[in-house]
Amino acid sequence: MVISDFEKWRKDRIILRDISRRILASLSTPLSWNGLAQDAGGIAANTAKEYVQLLADSYLLYILEFFNKSRKSASPNKNRKLYPFDPLIYLVLAQIANTTFDHRAEPHLIEGVVGEALMRNTETELFEGFARLTSTFYWRSTRDKEVDFVVLWNGEEIPIEVKYQSRISPSDYTTIKRSFGKGLVLTKDAFFPESGIYGLPVACFLYLLP
């Protein structure tokens, strides 16, 4: 269905396959349009951007932009992260990319599910697609220390780190603590509070959302 839709829009299925393959290989990793274009067979950066935005406008994946702390908004010129909207969409993209499910992708898919839930609760214009989010972002320091999500919720920025593991150490939330002074760490099954940082299982967090 996806391939036939793209062909109706006069898009190339080989380019779609190569872009899908690169997206699946780079889940939760910031990408540049140039880098994605080179890895998709050396196509033009604008072509890579167009295909990704079509996937996002088709509700198949969402584009997570870098969060500018001073402006409290996206920085479109920075690298962005791409996530399938749903684990089932991962399988759709895997079929397009002619690859099989990689179990190593599970933590990244869980991260993507968290992002999807945050979008549903913070974004007001999802009917226009997932290419231009205005309240859900990621953040990375000049030393390449990353926070998985930063959401603007009722005017407040809330940093969220997904650590899908049972054992959590202070090093797992150092970046949130130093850069934001507060935040949530979503774990596999661990709870903890520590000086403005609160840890709870992903499942509990998703259950508590409206």
Walk through the language-model features, giving the residues of each.
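Accessory nucleic acid-recognition modules appended to NTPase machines
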Residues: 1-147, 151-154
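Catalytic cores of nucleic-acid endonucleases
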Residues: 163-205
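Active-site ExK catalytic segment of metal-dependent nucleases
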Residues: 152-168
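A structural signal for isolated positions on well-ordered beta-strands in alpha/beta enzyme cores
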Residues: 137, 158, 184-185
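Conserved acidic residues
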Residues: 148, 157, 181
